[in-house]
UniProtKB/Swiss-Prot annotation:
It catalyses: aldehydo-D-ribose 5-phosphate = D-ribulose 5-phosphate. Pfam families: Rib_5-P_isom_A. It comes from the Eukaryota. CDD domains: RPI_A (cd01398). This is Probable ribose-5-phosphate isomerase 4, chloroplastic. One of its GO terms (biological process) is pentose-phosphate shunt, non-oxidative branch. Its main location: plastid. It is found in: Plastid, Chloroplast. It is an enzyme of class 5 (isomerase).
Length: 296
């Protein structure tokens, strides 16, 4: 049993208890792929083969692994291995990839039923499987953080695809925070005071090298929000506590932390694909983590 307690300047006073049990298994996967292929390609094939079923509505993520998964899903539909699958794209990139490979699309709206979603996470906290999304990849992705998070959260089940080094405890680096643009500076100062000594706060700019204030060309999303990158230079002890504390700040619209109770992380290592699944247990009142190591 692991107890996350208030041990850092940004932890809350309440404790979160996680109960976990591991059951590792090894068996062959992706037999049609050679050992030289990208680890993320193997992870993408494993995700489609093991989680996508005919008749599903699928949230189509964004990123390198998601591109591989979308392409493979299109091939499976074209060959007849899968049928009646509809994709809900999380970005213009995933919509374009899906259209290229012949996947029927339905665009996201409130109330749409999504059976399963996959997405590239920027990082995942070990054991809790809390994911970080929305770190800067390209300026075209900045406008889709809220949509990506919404689709993953409403899906009945989700998979985050990552590389081995992206899965660990004590994550560092940027946590994107969407804020009201009119009073962004006051919000940034409050966040900076809250994590003084642990993080820097930069307003994301649409061009490079604009400094912490975002210069003359800050990112403004289609909903009128600025994006603050809260860049942690020391390990974050609890992403759950961090998410709760950010949610309490006036003017914070949302952030790139996803706490999903039914999710799996598919970890692409050099020679194997490993999966870790999170499920809630009403009887135990906590979280159980199951692991499987899938040998290439």
């Amino acid at each position: 049993m692991v107890t996350a307690t208030a041990s850092t300047p940004f932890s809350l006073s309440s404790s979160v208890v996680f109960t976990r049990r591991r059951n590792f298994k090894r068996f062959p996967v992706c037999a049609s792929l050679s050992p030289e292929v990208s680890p993320l390609l193997r992870a993408a094939h494993h995700t489609v083969d093991n989680y996508v079923k005919s008749g599903m509505i699928i949230g189509l993520g964004s990123g390198e692994a998601s591109d591989f998964a979308i392409r493979y899903l299109g091939q499976q539909l074209g060959s007849g291995s899968l049928h009646n699958v509809v994709g809900v794209p999380m970005s213009a990139r995933s919509a374009s990839e899906a259209a290229k490979y012949g996947i029927p699309l339905e665009y996201y709206r409130d109330g749409v039923q999504i059976d399963f979603a996959f997405h590239d996470a920027d990082a995942v906290e070990e054991n809790t499987l809390i994911a970080v999304i929305g770190r800067r990849r390209s300026s075209q992705e900045d406008d889709y953080i809220l949509k990506q998070k919404s689709i993953v959260k409403v899906a009945d089940e989700a998979v985050f695809m990552i590389k081995e080094e992206q899965y660990k405890a004590g994550l560092e680096g940027s946590i994107p925070v969407l804020v009201q643009s009119l009073n962004w500076l006051a919000i940034a100062e409050e966040i900076d005071d809250l994590y003084l000594g642990d993080a820097e706060v930069w307003r994301r700019a649409s061009v490079e090298n604009e400094g912490p204030l975002g210069g003359d060309f800050p990112i403004v999303t289609s909903d009128g929000h600025n994006i603050l990158d809260v860049i942690f230079t020391t390990p974050i002890r609890s992403l759950a506590d961090l998410a709760t504390s950010l949610d309490k700040i006036d003017g914070v619209v949302d952030h790139g932390l996803i706490i999903k109770t039914r999710c799996t992380v598919v970890i692409a290592e050099e020679t194997v694909v490993r999966s870790v699944t999170l499920q809630t247990s009403a009887l135990e009142g906590g979280v159980r983590t199951y692991g499987q190591t899938l040998q290439k």
